[in-house]
UniProtKB/Swiss-Prot annotation:
Binding site for NADPH: 14-15, 35, 108, 140, 255, 279, 281
Active site residues according to the UniProt entry: 191 (proton acceptor)
Enzyme Commission code: 1.1.1.94
GO cellular component, one term: cytosol
InterPro entries in alphabetical order: 6-PGluconate_DH-like_C_sf (IPR008927), 6PGD_dom2 (IPR013328), G3P_DH_NAD-dep (IPR006168), G3P_DH_NAD-dep_C (IPR006109), G3P_DH_NAD-dep_N (IPR011128), NAD(P)-bd_dom_sf (IPR036291)
Family designation: Belongs to the NAD-dependent glycerol-3-phosphate dehydrogenase family.
The gene coding this protein: gpsA
Name of protein: Glycerol-3-phosphate dehydrogenase [NAD(P)+]
Annotated organism of origin: Pseudomonas putida (strain ATCC 47054 / DSM 6125 / CFBP 8728 / NCIMB 11950 / KT2440)
Chief location of this protein within or outside the cell: cytoplasm
Pathway, per record: Membrane lipid metabolism; glycerophospholipid metabolism
Gene Ontology biological process: carbohydrate metabolic process; glycerol-3-phosphate biosynthetic process; glycerol-3-phosphate catabolic process; glycerophospholipid biosynthetic process
Length: 341
């Protein structure tokens, strides 16, 4: 990658904009592509993304654009921050242009029809590209406001990890590397579901003990499912697992937490999502995750409980009561209980 070659960021949302700013602050020329030409022009003129990151100045090194073809042709390193529902339709027509390029997914979601993660879709579209993911406890606004933050870039291609570290690592943003792409990405996608439960618990005035129980049992569920799919359980003790889960389940800045909080205040799911005005991937993930967990026979009572709340008319109190009445099991999976016999 030559010094002046631009890095592409696909997506005009909050996280894509925050990452574009980080790149530009490190002296990297950035082309941020978005589907809406009016949004691109407004950001170019006003140097702000008022819908998704109001009050954050867009760095002069970020060029908002609407020409996807030109953006892909000009860049060898491409960060993909598109909604899970749109990623395939946006990039599949341009598959030939992606050959040999570095594609890094920023999207924490799962494709509904196939239960594929975003990097798996990228791999299908561009099998000869180098694929990676970026995930961790990364609230977009805090990144944009230069709060001290760490993240994980994961790929089977060590050179891609090093390339991402070189362009993103900075004074307030630390980038760690991992070879467990599947585990890192799955952690980022699964925790969105549990953030909805956490937001509901806070809105309903539940105690700190209850919230702590929900978060730790969520981690156990996430890990149990991920290991059944081939992920490394140790990945879930890092930034992309427990780190991301804690911040998403604890912060009112989290979109999925906000949806849960609105539900806890008595709003319908439709009202909560409409009020948010952005994609809350957890709602989409919940539907496909419940089905997949049943197919592979992985015990996920919180997922089943949240599905019952959102789509079957149950309340959070009923779900927690059911959880408390369930048969007690071991605290931490993957630790032998032979000593109990």
């Amino acid at each position: 990658m030559t010094e002046q070659q631009p890095v592409a960021v696909l997506g005009g949302g909050s996280f894509g904009t925050a990452v574009a700013n980080l790149l530009a602050e490190n002296g990297v020329p950035v082309r941020q592509w978005m589907r809406d030409p009016a949004q691109a022009e407004a950001m170019r003129v006003n140097r702000e993304n008022p819908r998704y990151l109001k009050g954050i100045r867009l760095h002069d090194g970020v060029e908002p654009v609407n020409d996807l073809l030109a953006t892909l042709q000009a860049s060898e390193l491409i960060f993909v921050a598109l909604p899970s529902s749109a990623l395939r339709s946006v990039l599949a027509p341009h598959a030939e242009l992606l050959r040999g390029k570095g594609l890094v997914s920023l999207t924490k979601g799962i494709e509904a029809q196939s239960f594929k993660l975003m990097s798996q879709i990228l791999e299908e579209i561009a099998p000869e590209a180098r694929i990676g993911v970026l995930s961790g406890p990364n609230l977009a606004r805090e990144i944009a406001e230069h709060a001290l933050t760490a993240t994980v870039v994961a790929s089977e291609h060590e050179d891609l990890c090093q390339q991402v570290q070189a362009v993103l690592h900075g004074r307030t943003f630390r980038v760690y590397a991992s070879a467990d792409r599947f585990g890192v990405e799955l952690g980022g996608a699964l925790k969105n579901v549990y953030a909805i439960i956490a937001g509901m618990a806070v809105a309903l005035g539940m105690g700190e003990n209850t919230k702590s129980m929900l978060i730790t049992r969520a981690l156990a569920e996430m890990t149990r499912f991920a290991v059944s799919q081939g992920a490394n359980p140790m990945t879930f003790l890092g930034l992309a697992g427990v780190g991301d889960l804690i911040v998403t389940c604890s912060s009112p800045k989290s979109r999925n937490y906000q949806v849960g909080y609105a539900l806890g205040q008595g709003q319908s799911l439709e009202e909560a999502v409409n009020r948010l005005g952005e994609v809350a991937e957890g709602v989409n993930t919940l539907k496909v995750l419940k089905t997949k967990a049943q197919q592979v026979q992985v015990y996920m009572p919180l997922v089943a409980g949240l599905h019952a709340i959102l789509f079957e008319g149950r309340t959070l109190n009923q779900v927690i009561e059911h959880l408390m009445r369930a048969e007690p099991k071991t605290d931490v999976d993957f630790i032998s209980i032979s000593g109990f016999n």
